[in-house]
Amino acid sequence: NIQAFWIYRNYFMNEFDAKLGEIVLVASEDTHYSIPKGANLLQIDRISVPVDFETRAINEEQLEELLLIAKANGKKYFIIVSNMGTTMFGSVDNPETYTSLLERHQLIYKLHIDGAYGGFVYPFNNEKSVINFSNPKISSITIDAHKMLQAPYGTGIFICRKGLIENVL
């Protein structure tokens, strides 16, 4: 996951001359603990989006409010982390919840899918899912063979769209 944040932070700086304080990472309150750690390591501000207690779905109204507050506070570039199976609940975020609001308010973003937990299961059990690279709004995906396939540590996989990795080379 941190690779995505590193790439997108640098992408915004390289392509838009963004300042660090103009970049923010947005993820649900159920996201993996590596997400806030990665934001901290890269000195990226972070917004934690509340979820519904029963369904664990992103609270759209609060997300919109948080995005508008961030914009009013000078945030211009948004790194979005959408979960494909959280470790605590197995919940899957709908990336469209994020992208529809970001686009409605004309906010610049990159969308990362954290599929470390569910990436080896969810796509195969949900044939109609658009949480894959057929969705042009998705910039990167993380999957981890350690979590579901019982492979050794260090078998995490990060995949991003062509041209993005150059921002960290």
Describe each PLM feature range.
Residues 3-168:
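Conserved PLP-enzyme active-site core in the AAT-like
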